[in-house]
Amino acid sequence: MGARASVLTGGKLDQWEKIYLRPGGKKKYMMKHLVWASRELERFACNPGLMDTAEGCAQLLRQLEPALKTGSEGLRSLFNTLAVLYCVHNNIKVQNTQEALEKLREKMKAEQKEPEPEQAAGAAAAPESSISRNYPLVQNAQGQMVHQPLSPRTLNAWVKVVEEKAFNPEVIPMFMALSEGATPQDLNTMLNTVGGHQAAMQMLKEVINEEAAEWDRGHPVHMGPIPPGQVREPRGSDIAGTTSTLAEQVAWMTANPPVPVGDIYRRWIVLGLNKIVRMYSPASILDIKQGPKETFRDYVDRFYKTLRAEQATQEVKNWMTETLLVQNANPDCKNILRALGPGASLEEMMTACQGVGGPAHKARVLAEAMTQAQTATSVFMQRGNFKGIRKTIKCFNCGKEGHLARNCKAPRKKGCWKCGQEGHQMKDCRSGERQFFREGLASLQREARKFPPDNNKERANSPSNRELWVSGGEDHTGDREGRKGEDRELSVPTLNFPQITLWQRPILTVKIGGEIKEALLDTGADDTVIEEIQLEGKWKPKMIGGIGGFIKVKQYDNVIIEIQGKKAVGTVLVGPTPVNIIGRNFLTQIGCTLNFPISPIETIPVKLKPGMDGPRVKQWPLTEEKIKALTEICTEMEKEGKISRIGPENPYNTPIFAIKKKDSTKWRKLVDFRELNKRTQDFWEVQLGIPHPAGLKKKKSVTVLDVGDAYFSCPLDENFRKYTAFTIPSVNNETPGIRYQYNVLPQGWKGSPAIFQSTMTKILEPFRKNNPELVIYQYMDDLYVGSDLEITQHREAVERLRSHLLTWGFTTPDKKHQKEPPFLWMGYELHPDKWTVQTIQLPEKDTWTVNDIQQLVGKLNWASQIYPGIKVKQLCKLIRGAKALTEVVTLTREAELELAENREILKEPVHGAYYNPDKELIAEIQKQGQGQWTYQIYQDLHKNLKTGKYAKMRSTHTNDIRQLTEVVQKVALESIVIWGKTPKFRLPVQKEVWETWWTEYWQATWIPDWEFVNTPPLVKLWYQLETEPISGAETYYVDGAANRETKLGKAGFVTDRGRQKVTSISETTNQQAELQAVLMALQDAGQEVNIVTDSQYVLGIIHSQPDKSESELVNQIIEELIKKERIYLSWVPAHKGIGGNEQIDKLVSTGIRKVLFLDGIDKAQEEHERYHSNWKAMASDFNLPPIVAKEIVASCDKCQLKGEAIHGQINCSPGVWQLDCTHLEGKIILVAVHVASGYLEAEVIPAETGQETAYFILKLAGRWPVKVIHTDNGSNFTSATVKAACWWANIQQEFGIPYNPQSQGAVESMNKELKKIIGQIRDQAEHLKTAVQMAVFIHNFKRKGGIGGYTAGERIIDIIATDIQTTKLQTQILKVQNFRVYYRDSREPTWKGPAKLLWKGEGAVVIQDNGDIKVVPRRKAKIIRDYGKQMAGDGCVASGQDESQDME
């Protein structure tokens, strides 16, 4: 492809590079345009080699021209490029692309006027112009139309389009362009090449079948034979190419008159592609809205792209364009578009909205005003760009020459851009001269405002209130004295200063050399530049870098400028500037500064949880000294703007109290935000853990900073502040309490950490980009700054960081600014080449409480990350169970020994190394015994990066290899978090042992790289189970049973050799009895044994090959297993009549299991234990008397708490469902109830969003006929996504009454029922989502009651089946009523009627005649359709009508 760059050489290449892309533009054609064109030609299935000659270019242009109307912008650009190349080959001189296209059109017209003789002859031979001249049908030398197969390039281009565009709207015009003139066979070839998209092709196939059937209905086949020489008429399947040959297709397309089967088939395919595009691009045109920061051009692009995918008529699309395009624009653009008036063209809209980007436009202005650069940023232009005469351009917005409206710096104007009036467009303007709507601002209306006395507080409250201050000036309001001596926060000037808010451009009226002008105060500009002003004195010529390049200006020195009553003398430049600018050379003289409140950061919006209100917790009494301390603290906080006083209109309250700080006489204010935290929305933690020093790279220079008053520097959402209200009471209720609310993030509120972290990240992001040489670790208010710079450069960079943070209101106190090692950071101690944890002192105590042990274990866990060998298992055993914090515990001998060992380990300081990315990570694991493990991660031997321990027993019964795999997983995860990769493992286990375990028992696919290290004690499997029965060994059938009430049980075995043994046990359970039976069998058996059990519990324990357990009984079984040479364990289902199992079952059940004279009781009890079915379901399924079934429910400890659920039914339509979200265990459960039947669908969803809810609704609609859904007014249910899903599935959505649970009665009661069932079976499932599905199953199929005594599952099926039958019957009735009956009475021979047919049977019909219902034999009745009023009698229709032809 690169060879295409040599299309032009020598002089022609020079000529090519002199041609402009656009008239009046700056860019010219370059070599890269030729390379691009050759690649595009390959995409459009054309030969790039044709570009080398003029004739080739002409062929390509003829090929591409028919597709221009439907083609994309890329196709037009390619055509334009080839047109210019054609002119260069033919030495036609052109200046730009437009001229090349005009020359090409002239040449084509000339060729049409003077056709060549051969062309004329060809035209005479084939006069019909409708025949396709494009491929694949071409005319041979004899004048016949022959088929030319599609080229591989065309097919390749089509495949690329589908793969790259993935069925977005652009696929349709590309298909039209590539399939021009194709036959149905060619079109099928194109479709077959993208057969991988089976779903799309199936949809396309369905559309084609429907269109083919419609064609057949509209074009019936003519009867009789086809005349000789005439082609048969195509059927729908012929057009689709399935039942027609290529020759027939060509004949139809070239006949006279032609039948364009190719074009018809293309239309069908386009209909199908429209449907596919709609599916693959599900965004509705209603959802396309302009973002607040989105440019109008991008919004229009998205709008029309989505509009192309909409399946609607052109009239509807026109209406969408006229209404929705303006309606869904952002407020800034909407104002401009409405000012243009109705009927404005898209071009006028695009022109008017150039450069407008909502808040982005404001942000650009703000950024411009905040720029503090010391030197001007000049934009230099290439000198070559001044060659030649260029057409001058004029701005629509300000009327000045030299720039376009989108680059205009002047304020954007509303209304007509010619006269300034609103209500008409510029094209309709009748005014002759321009008037600019900003002229009214020339007077001094923009008077400086004064702050109210408490404005300091207000500025802290509103982070959006950024101000430009002019210091020390006279106030135009007349109050020249001002307020002196008042306290100022963050060096804010005295309150009589004028202010100019920066939410609009700071344009003021100024006096320059006696003339009044409007000018922009620009703190980012060095110089002051004014346009069209006559100043006295001499001037010097000067060139400055301005907007759009260099501009020539006149420099006047010692000019007097008056701004807001302040005078200054300096240099003024006069020249063609788009907007008058007052630069820093004058602003610094008058003391103009940029000032910020506490935080210029945008607040993050916060809401309460749906349906909840703020906290209303009463303030508890406080002592006098605490009230005094809180009053002082709050007074200081109010001065600083962190809190504000509020009145009685705020109904919310949170209690506060005070505690003394550690080792201090000062008090600390605490707010009990527990109730507010429950009611506040959930937040996503921005940072999932704390950074670890082992992951730090070694740096030459390091600094540690701390952000002071971190939370109090971040503003709280204004709408949320009222919920943080608190009250300081008075002693003996002497006066009403003083009420405050927070303006900043409060300590103890659940949202503060996440919002602060997010805010700090946004603030540091630009600094990180501008200073890539610095590594900044940020966790809450701790900052680690490292670099490889020299110490002086590093400290300069740190000072820049501190200044950057201060700009945003974050201070970094000197007392916590650590410049020299060791650095104390995040509980660690950092040295230049090593790290350790901060010094740990273990307390010496005679008596230990639970709280003491908890703190001790916390310290040891912290130390274990660098001190290898730390153990805490025995200490943790001391505080198992629910114990009070102050309860005294006695150290066991093992715990004392463990603590003594840990003290010894901590005596010698241990240090960790820093991470080197160039070296390999190695993790070594050792077994310490008693289920405890230790590990080290290092790169160089004896220089650990990090150490750790592991002592978890994830299951009651485990073995060393399972624990080792858990340690490996923990270390791998830890390594990924800290270093982003997994280490190579060195494990104390032999390859054979490890591989045996992994292949036989471990269900996992990921195995890390590891090698064997011979570090005793080695891990091994102590016994192994056989996978097949052992021939010749005795087989033991084991079983156990226990009575729940008496706790008495039996365990025993029966062998295949006739031996048996049964033992009675006290204080046992079924599971313990089953284990006891296995132990008895193992103790009785020889070295080889087969054991058969019916207990999945026993099978699960022994199959996991444990070598240790917390159960003494299981430990005894393990000892017996180790003694055996070979063991085979098998499971059989209970109560299925299996010989040995049934025999032992009867033996151990005697006198243990209850017998209530009915065989089904055991099964019912077993089912109830599993599903907690209600008594009606058990009585029905197991044929139990109601009293017995109720006794089973009553004896269940989980079902007797709240009694039996009351079932009732609401008489509703079969298609009505109620949906609601409920919460359990911190998770969200979306519940749907079929109101008529009580049938339940529920699912745990990851988030309460519209997307998840819509997906659930679509799944529900795919399973059941859903006509109406009834929901509350939650944000997820009212979202556009849910509305779109309901629209697509044709579901009507209804909403309940806000905060009224009765309007959602069915689903609300079902929420309680579902939670109750989950509570009964929760211990059977590990995850909540499993428990939810189990509870749904139980409710739908294991609980009977309500209408019909059905389960909910049976009831919904019955209701739907009945509804279908009723509908069908109703249809039949309506069909029957379309007939009329003429009948004869037995006594009279004349025909009577017509009567209304009510029912038609085999031997008689039921009719209604004049209100009387009669039964008439079929032989005396004639049934006919109701064709209107007929006369009965001789020769009437009734006498000759055959009913069998009219009615089935």
From Swiss-Prot:
InterPro entries: Aspartic_peptidase_AS, DNA/RNA_pol_sf, Gag_p24_C, Integrase-like_N, Integrase_C_dom_sf_retrovir, Integrase_C_retrovir, Integrase_cat-core, Integrase_Zn-bd_dom_N
Zn-finger (CCHC-type) residues: 393-410, 414-431
Ranges where the record places region Disordered: 107-129, 446-490
CDD domains given in the database record: HIV_retropepsin_like (cd05482), RT_Rtv (cd01645)
Active site residues of this protein: 522
Record's GO cellular component terms: host cell; host cell cytoplasm; host cell nucleus; host cell plasma membrane; membrane; viral nucleocapsid
Domain RNase H type-1 residues, every copy: 1030-1153
DNA-binding region: 1379-1426
Activity control mechanisms: The viral protease is inhibited by many synthetic protease inhibitors (PIs), such as amprenavir, atazanavir, indinavir, loprinavir, nelfinavir, ritonavir and saquinavir. RT can be inhibited either by nucleoside RT inhibitors (NRTIs) or by non nucleoside RT inhibitors (NNRTIs). NRTIs act as chain terminators, whereas NNRTIs inhibit DNA polymerization by binding a small hydrophobic pocket near the RT active site and inducing an allosteric change in this region.
Low complexity: bias regions: 118-128
Gene3D superfamilies, per the entry: 1.10.10.200, 1.10.1200.30, 3.30.70.270, Acid Proteases, HIV Type 1 Reverse Transcriptase, subunit A, domain 1, Human Immunodeficiency Virus Type 1 Capsid Protein, Immunodeficiency lentiviruses, gag gene matrix protein p17, Integrase, C-terminal domain superfamily, retroviral
Cofactor: Mg(2+)
Site positions per UniProt: Cleavage: 135-136, 366-367, 380-381, 435-436, 497-498, 596-597, 1036-1037, 1156-1157
UniProt modified residues of type Phosphotyrosine: 135
Residues that bind Mg(2+) 3: 1220, 1272
GO biological process, alphabetically ordered: DNA integration; DNA recombination; establishment of integrated proviral latency; proteolysis; symbiont entry into host cell; symbiont-mediated suppression of host gene expression; viral genome integration into host DNA; viral penetration into host nucleus
Covalently attached lipid (N-myristoyl glycine), positions: 2
Site residues by UniProt (Essential for RT p66/p51 heterodimerization): 997, 1010
Residues with site note (Cis/trans isomerization of proline peptide bond): 224-225
Record: residues binding Mg(2+) 1: 706, 781-782
Further details from the record: The reverse transcriptase is an error-prone enzyme that lacks a proof-reading function. High mutations rate is a direct consequence of this characteristic. RT also displays frequent template switching leading to high recombination rate. Recombination mostly occurs between homologous regions of the two copackaged RNA genomes. If these two RNA molecules derive from different viral strains, reverse transcription will give rise to highly recombinated proviral DNAs.
Name the UniProt record assigns to this protein: Gag-Pol polyprotein
Species name: Simian immunodeficiency virus (isolate EK505)
This protein's encoding gene: gag-pol
